[in-house]
Every structure is written in C-alpha cells, then in structure tokens.
Design a protein with these regions (language model features):
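Macrodomain-like recognition of ADP-ribose-binding/processing modules
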Residues: 1-172
C-alpha cells in the first residue's frame, strides 16, 4: 500500500512539473557528427510572430544555456539567431532585423556576464586567461532577399569587432 502511494506521488509530481516556455533541458549524443550535447529551449507558437523584450523567457533560456556552457567547459555552440527553425510569411525584413538585434544584444550581454565571472584577475595581481568561445548564429533558409545583408551589417556595430571577434559567412 505504501509503495503504491509513493508511486502515485512521483507521478503527480512529474505531471505538476511540466516544462514551460524558456525552460532548457540537455541531451547527450554519441551518434551525431561533431555534436555531443544538445541544449533544447522550450518555446511556443507565439515566438514565431511576437516581438521579444530582453525579459522574454526564451532569452532567459538562452542566458541559462550560455551560463551552462561555461560551467560545463563547452566553448562552441550554435544558436538560431531568430529563435525559429523555419522562415515564414509573417517574418518581414523589419521583424527579422528587430529580432536579430535583440538576440545579438542579449547574447553579447550574456557573454560579457560570464566572461566577467570567469576572466577576472588572479590573486596577486596577475591576469587569468579569458576563455575563448565560438558562437555560431544561424539563420533559417528561405528568408526574404536583403535580410541576411541587413542582419550581418548590424553585427559589427553591436559587437564592435576586435581582433578576438570575427565574422565568418558559411553557406549551407
């Protein structure tokens, strides 16, 4: 009888802890080429068309992913820049540029935050090494003409290119 109650309690707790928008979970992979770990960001359909603020749960999820990569020693990640998998008709050029700008600025802030935590000065006044991160910002295929050019032109104005920051174009 006690075992049955315990099992029912576990099932109830599992049902009560459903994933919400912005939650992140992680899976390990050994059969994917060059991928060992995948962070999954929980989103909903409103992300396809809604404007984002810096307080949106999905951007907080990206922040948690960046923080986890530092904690786990992961130095290379791919982030969908528009936070969508596929282009759709309602994604105007203006919408894409606004979304990209918001994600650019948030990712930059998250990187500055984690680099401030892990790249401070050492005891005795010496400088510790600052970690090197490769962030691949990916755009969905099928975007309107001119979107890629406008979004890539925005990159150096937000990240203020320095020798340690480079922008590479990779065609699918």
């Amino acid at each position: 009888m006690k075992a049955k109650q315990s099992k029912e309690k576990i099932i109830k707790e599992t049902l009560d802890t459903a994933l919400e928008v912005g939650d992140v979970y992680c899976t390990r992979h050994s059969n994917l080429r060059d991928v060992q770990l995948v962070f999954h960001l929980v989103v909903d359909d409103t992300l396809q068309s809604a404007d984002l603020s810096s307080r949106h749960p999905c951007l907080n999820g990206i922040r948690n992913i960046v923080r986890l990569t530092v904690r786990l020693g992961i130095t290379s990640i791919h982030i969908p820049l528009l936070l969508v998998e596929q282009a759709s008709e309602n994604m105007t050029i203006a919408w894409c540029v606004r979304r990209a700008e918001m994600v650019y600025k948030c990712v930059k802030g998250y990187l500055m935050e984690v680099c401030g935590v892990c790249g401070g000065s050492a005891v005795g006044g010496g400088v510790t090494s600052v970690p090197h991160f490769n962030i691949h910002l990916v755009l969905p295929s099928g975007l309107a003409d001119g979107v890629y050019q406008q979004i890539s032109a925005m990159f150096p104005t937000i990240f203020h290119l320095v020798p340690s920051v480079s922008m590479a174009v990779q065609e699918p």
